[in-house]
Amino acid sequence: MFVMPVAAQQAASDSAATMKEHTLSSVTITSRKATMRPLKGALNGKDISRDELFKAACCNLGESFVTNPSVDVNYSDATTGAKQVKLLGLSGTYVQMLTENLPNFRGAALPYGLGYVPGNWMKSMQVSKGNSSVKNGYEAMTGQINVEYVKPEDEEGLSLNLYGSTMGKFEANADGNIHIKGKDLSTEILAHFENNWNHHDGNGDGFQDDPQVKQFNLQNRWLWKTGNYVFHGGLSLLKEDRTNGQVDKALSMFGGTTPYRINIGTERYEGYMKHAFILNAAHGTNIALLGNVSLHKQDALYGIKQYDVNEKNAYASLVFETNFTPEHNLSAGLSFNHDYLHQRLSLPSGAIPSDYGNLYPLERGIESETTPGAYVQYTYNLHDHLVAMAGLRVDHSNVYGTFLTPRFHLKWMPAQIFTVRISAGKGYRSAHALAENNYLMASGRRLIIDNLKQEAAWNYGSSLSFVIPVGKQALKLNADYYYTHFLSQAIIDYDTNPQELHITNLDGKSYSHTFQVDASYLFFNSLELTAAYRYNLVKTTYGGQLLSKPLQGRYKALVTASYKTPLGLWQFDATAVLNGGGRMPQPYTTPSGDLSWQPNFKAYGQLNAQVTRYFRHFSVYVGGENLTNYKQKNPIVGYNNPWGNSFEPTMVYGPVQGAMAYIGVRVNLGKRL
């Protein structure tokens, strides 16, 4: 008689719970529950589950796109650890970041905000391309990323996670919730700690390959339900210290008496609330009041340049929704957003301000903008086969005046195997140039910032999706094309003057064409393969010349494989990526007669892999990142003289670290997410 072990029974039960049947054109398809699904409705995007995120280490939001063909995350420079997300070939300033469907990580939080969301706090993530709904504001130009945290109302229990890497990074995460009064009153605490103590200098340039980061992050969330009223709310606080610069041996290698150091200290406080009043459940009629506030304090020292910023943000939205009939939905609302930045930029006594740009001395650099607005959105939904969504916003900025935001989305599914989506719309944003790009302070160039206009762009997109029965499974094919055309834009000009970094207004054309195809198929109900290819054509006018955007790869090819054994005890994941080459900023000739850098960079490949072993109440995972060990050669230009004006750590297009291994454990006591 064969008796299945308890752990195997549990894993088999969990695996069976993820099985799902689909009936498609008289063909019955049995498959494991998808970890990445298309968004419902007219928007083009993906709903990414926790299982998909955990196919890699996923230490934070910035590391959660490893298996995603649409989104790139790159270092902004080689010293601070700042990262930016890219969607449709454009930087993260044009991607609206949301947490729990509330705008977040604006201004000074933008360069490091991807590290403020621990991976183990995330329950799911929604990534949409192109313009999003007008409900969330006017800012999403190229897409929207929304993070859903684990919930107080989830199954009661405690989750723990420990992680360590060969690069000297350690992380600990915990989240626990209790139901005080059934599921009508619940609370949850999430905690995170990380410490990277390594001083590794793998390329011998005298600088640490990665900043030392110590972060404490704590969040408390509540849910209360009574009758037709639902309340969600919470508070969070974060404290982070990051340091980088020359290692001890650098002075003996290159001379000098004072090591170049970067120190960035951050404190961040957030609060949010959601009040929902259900007026008529049968017709989906409800009123909701949503809001969040944040205080972001950052003190930074880049060599001898001091930059301090105190940023406050408040956002509120009053929303009314109703279904006139099952096919007709109306959403209307009011919104309010306020940004306040108090910035201080200074040099030590004796320094000549003009040697460092046009910003010194900036003793009281205040940027303040208040923007109330209103929107209306109509959606027609015919049995999910035809969905048309049209919305219009009107907003008034005390800085830029009144502006309109029209957006339209259409989904047409003429057959179960075929879906067409199209979209068109406009987006705006206010550039806080120094706060959003404060990593540029690490450069030795003079930093010049002009009086910037409000950014504005039109975005148009279309997509085709096929779900084709092949054998016992479905072959999923997708193709999409997006065009973004800027009417006004704040650009960072690396090209015109090799002694300057110039943030200025667009004077000419700027656009992005992005084309992507991807396919996925589940073999033997255990092995899931995905292949994707994306091509970007991004051009901007710099100094009167229409040039390809620098430090931007022209294409990306990705293949992912995920295999789970029949009993669900083992899982093997691998991701291979080929990143296309691109243009570097215009090089200059050094005093020795050499070029500062090559005019172009070549394509490079990366490989990530992870093995997970599941037990009844915990799992252990072991993996490696950048197993091809590709590193950008000399990511810091002028590393032998960091106090000179030729010191340039922002010429980064690829990895600055080599291969890395890691190990982690996830423990679930009572919870099943």
Where are these regions (language model features)?
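C-terminal beta-signal and adjacent terminal beta-strands/loops
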Residues: 529, 578-588, 612-673
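Extracytoplasmic beta-strand/coil segments of soluble accessory domains associated
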Residues: 62-103, 123
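Short acidic/polar hinge/loop motifs at secondary-structure boundaries
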Residues: 84, 102-129, 218
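Membrane-embedded beta-barrel scaffold of Gram-negative outer-membrane proteins
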Residues: 286-300, 413, 421, 453-511
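Gram-negative outer-membrane beta-barrel transporters
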Residues: 381-384, 477, 481-485, 505-588, ...
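A beta-strand signature from Gram-negative outer-membrane beta-barrel systems
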Residues: 116-157, 671
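Flexible loop and strand-edge segments within Gram-negative outer membrane beta-barrel domains
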Residues: 196-216, 225-287, 293-311
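N-terminal periplasmic "start-of-domain" segments of outer-membrane beta-barrel proteins
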Residues: 23-56, 84
